[in-house]
Amino acid sequence: MTGCASGKQETAAPEAAQTESPAAEETTAEPEQTEEVPAEEEAPKAPETVSFTDSLGRTVELPADITRIAPSGAVATMILAAIAPECMVTINAAPSESQMAFLPANLAALPETGQMYGSKANLNLETLLAADPQVVIDLGDKKGDMTEDLDALQEQIGIPVIFIEADLPHMAAAFRTLGGLLSGKADRGEALAALVDRTTTMAEENAAKITDDMRVRVMYTTGEDGLGTNAAGSMQAQVLDMVGVENAVVVEDVSNKGGGNIISLEQLYNFDPDVILFADGSIYSTVTDDSAWSQLTAISTGKYYEVPGSPYNWLSGPPSMNMILGVWWLGNLIYPEIYDYDMQTMTQELYKTLWGYELSSEEVTALLGNSTLKAAAQ
């Protein structure tokens, strides 16, 4: 990856002009008249700042050459780590050892600043200021009184703060915007945007082929007891909507938080989905031994799977660029005759594009062992 390493582009010094000495003149020749050559005009200096209008309509003055950036939280960390990890001067939380197996090495040493939004909002301003970023970047979905929040933070720290909308429908545009803002990142931004465009186009075309009688009712669960659910309409369940399954969990007050809506066992029995997706770290491995779960259709028929979770959960947690993996994975898992491709090969391609990481066959097997490979063996 290029860009952000130095923050300044060097320009080669102009070559000295080559002149030829005129042949010697006879002493009787009249003196040669010379013309005054005007001094070269200095090239105009590049602007030090540019005006940027963010996704909230806020106009913010930014450095023209951005090489030091700070994410506002988990979603921003994931996206910025994909496009410009070497530009990051902070991280929301230190990646685990298992995550670092796939992520750029420099992320492990970055100071942690927490996050601006969410149930665990704990932005550490002292650490943020000490890292001396040129701009704080918030990415994700629009929520609450963001304009007031970002204006207040910007005034408090004296550093530009911007928001770029980056939910699944806006993610390609977000990568292109970042590619234009960050020094030397236009090509990288376009490569990531092209992958998002390819993914969403593929999903839209395939989802259109799914008729109502083919619709599979899917439930996506989280938490140690499996009763945290990402309901229909939730930001955390965007992949289900895009792929074309029916989200089996329908509630009145939809939560967009990471844990989703907590439901009761009675509600679980009423929903009784065709397929259950367990987030990594949930009860996938013990669910068949639990009488409260074993009577469910998905469990009794073996149609339950674990969502791959390295370096991040492929469906959400947080809902960010990891959803690109989730679209390819879930479509192929539920409708393999429509989303018709080799998911093992696709996984290797996606990790290479997103993280620059070459997955081995053994690593692919470990990632897909409780989902794609399990389904293929059924």
Residue ranges and their predicted role:
Residues 55-57, 113-126, 253-265:
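Short helix-initiation/N-cap motifs at beta->coil->alpha
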Residues 49-52, 59-61, 148-228, 308-371, ...:
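Extracytoplasmic substrate-binding proteins
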Residues 131, 250-306:
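A contiguous binding-surface segment within folded domains or other stable secondary-structure elements
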Residues 2-3:
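C-terminal motif of bacterial Sec signal peptides marking the signal peptidase cleavage site
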Residues 117, 229-259:
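Alpha-helical, coiled-coil/dimerization segments enriched in small aliphatic residues
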Residues 8-47:
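Low-complexity, Pro/Thr/Ser/Glu-rich flexible segments characteristic
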Residues 70-72, 89-92, 135-139, 160-165, ...:
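Structural recognition of the beta-strand scaffold that forms the well-ordered cores
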Residues 76-131, 135-143, 245-248:
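A short, structured surface patch at a secondary-structure boundary
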